[in-house]
């Protein structure tokens, strides 16, 4: 049986281990780092987490994270409101913004279709997307989902759904590795994928 630490330190390790991308050893390193860190540093982390939980919300229009709704992208009159880029998560918005190649709007689904995890189309932010498309200003929807099985299934579902409209539906060009995540794509590759998007 593996040795566990007593009480509070083990609870902290377990809490960090529950975060994505952090395994048991990484969680232990972070916990002990905080144990030995100056009180101000630990308090700054506590304050940052508390502030995020209290202030950050999802944009009523696109579903991106923001402190005030609508988010800065939706509220910006200089953006191209005729194009909506559909992404899985808010972090994908930031990845695309870093390319400086895209000046349109976004729509965050909040996930992808995944029957294995019991995530159905009705669990995603699709109804709000359909509502937005009733605005005659929208001329193109870019499906910018991760090139993995779930992303492809969601892209296929959305392209069939949107084929009933007069809106041009495109997807990112190749260059992104199959099974990869937009979050990890470099700016040049992602920028080229946006520029070379193709009809679906």
From Swiss-Prot:
May play a role in DNA repair. It seems to be involved in an RecBC-independent recombinational process of DNA repair. It may act with RecF and RecO. A zinc finger (C4-type) spans 59-74. Signal peptide: none annotated. The keyword 4Fe-4S does not apply. NCBIfam families: recR (TIGR00615). Belongs to the RecR family. It comes from Bifidobacterium adolescentis (strain ATCC 15703 / DSM 20083 / NCTC 11814 / E194a). Residues 82-177 form the Toprim domain. InterPro entries: DNA_Rcmb_RecR, Rcmb_RecR, Rcmb_RecR_Znf, TOPRIM_dom, TOPRIM_RecR. Keywords: DNA damage, DNA recombination, DNA repair, Metal-binding, Zinc, Zinc-finger. The keyword Kinase does not apply. GO terms for biological process: DNA recombination; DNA repair. SMART domains: TOPRIM. Pfam families: RecR_C (PF21175), RecR_HhH (PF21176), RecR_ZnF (PF02132), Toprim_4 (PF13662). GO terms for molecular function: DNA binding; zinc ion binding. This is Recombination protein RecR.
